[in-house]
Amino acid sequence: MEGSMALSKWHAYSRLMRIDRPIGSLLLLWPTYWALWIAAQSIPSLHILIVFTAGVFLMRAAGCVINDFADRHFDGHVERTKHRPLPSGDVTEKEAKILFASLVGLSFLLVLTLNSMTIWLSVAGLALAWIYPFVKRVSHLLQVVLGAAFGWSIPMGFSAVSESLPLVCWVLFLVNILWSVIYDTQYAMVDRNDDLKIGVKSTAILFGQYDKLIIGILQIVMIVLLVLVGSLADLGAVYYIALSLSALLFIYQQKLMVDRERAPCFKAFLNNNYVGLILFIGIFLSYL
């Protein structure tokens, strides 16, 4: 009986951490790898790869926990989220706090194996991860904060590899903010009607009828900035081929969003995983 209860509790924790939905971790992992490879101009050390890969999954899990904790009084009113562990009572508020602290603690132990500059940067990263879920109460620009939080691994990666934060680092950071606004607006379009009812803010609500147009403009700006990244990092032709393929995927996403229906918008969101992967392959092959 106790074993069954423990298994049930672990299942609830895993759902709270979104272990069954790795898309969020992957969208965080690809920009981290872009940064590590560009900073090293080669394959990064095994130690740094292990620290940042594990850190991505731990901090994404921590982000999901604090996000659900912040939304615990709202999720019960949204069809897609009403069965999440906190609103359903499968996980208590105290358990969520302990789980969040444990995940952050493990992440910080990993960071302690890196240089002091990276350790200090991680403190700012934690602050961004903490405030992100609460921004939706006061601003429609939640996705911008998400981009900064998700992208903070970029300056941390450059710091860990080279102990410097060159221009290409910040251009890449800006690229990630734009990308986060793109894919999280697509994600928010799925919940727009529910969010309007309960008073939660998002860029999908802010952009309104111009959502597809603004996403398209952001996609174009992102591609232009990635061309600049290629120039600053002296990346090869294979990178620009990958960039062209990513642009085609953005066109495909626009087609998916044409009627603003929930399922196709969610599919457009998921498609961004391939954008990140293809860009990483282009960067990886450029340094072989």
UniProtKB/Swiss-Prot annotation:
Pathway: Cofactor biosynthesis; ubiquinone biosynthesis
Topology within the bilayer: Multi-pass membrane protein
Catalytic reactions of this protein: all-trans-octaprenyl diphosphate + 4-hydroxybenzoate = 4-hydroxy-3-(all-trans-octaprenyl)benzoate + diphosphate
Cofactor: Mg(2+)
Pfam families: UbiA
Family statement: Belongs to the UbiA prenyltransferase family.
Family annotation (NCBIfam families): ubiA_proteo
Biological role: Catalyzes the prenylation of para-hydroxybenzoate (PHB) with an all-trans polyprenyl group. Mediates the second step in the final reaction sequence of ubiquinone-8 (UQ-8) biosynthesis, which is the condensation of the polyisoprenoid side chain with PHB, generating the first membrane-bound Q intermediate 3-octaprenyl-4-hydroxybenzoate.
Protein name as it appears in the record: 4-hydroxybenzoate octaprenyltransferase
Gene, per the UniProt record: ubiA
